[in-house]
């Protein structure tokens, strides 16, 4: 399969805003809160990875009395990813906290309008408005980020990460053996998903939480802060690269637990 390097004239993850927006707090070493009334947690992964990115988060949540389940996205279209997320949500009994990492914020924003969902949690995730796509959130004319160097497009229309640059782009602070394994088992995402728009925005009516990855090299940190402010989220910053579920699973689980114990 022949791959072509992604150029700045195409859809990339550049710097959207040149100014910085304040977050509520900067947090490290959060403490997980044991499960209360809301125990069900639905986890939605991002591009280039599959549901296994949540492995250690799931373990921590289970140990604290939660019932986590991870969605496996097909990533051949946003429409099908929304369907896959809804299928998992439909199997849940009782209230749910819906969690999205990176691209996973797109289906979370759409599916989160379901009455079962009591809160939304975003980790360096897309948080679009109604009628927005990922393309709409990103500025293709701004300077690029280092993680762009890893992104390639296959001739059949999928984004991939160059395995040798996978860690640099997503998780240069995560355990190297885990990152190396994920780089050769990555899941590509169809280019067309970046132009598909959400038709609902659950954060308008649901409580939301947002964890900014302050050392992100593939999604602009300023964009994350902007989205968090736009949706009115309770916001923290984690000193980590893009893939917090890999590098800081304990903090990710703890932040989810804060959301779960804050809703009724």
PLM feature spans:
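Bacterial N-terminal signal peptides that target proteins for export
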Residues: 2-13
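Bacterial N-terminal signal peptides
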Residues: 12-22
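Conserved HGGG/HGGXW glycine-rich cap/lid loop of the alpha/beta-hydrolase fold
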Residues: 36-78
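Conserved serine/cysteine hydrolase catalytic core
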Residues: 81, 187-231, 235-249, 254
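Gly/Ala-rich beta-loop-alpha elbow adjacent to hydrolase catalytic centers
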Residues: 99-104, 108
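Flexible "cap/lid" loop of the alpha/beta hydrolase fold
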Residues: 116-117, 121-163, 190-194
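Conserved alpha/beta-hydrolase catalytic His-Asp/Glu region
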Residues: 155-202
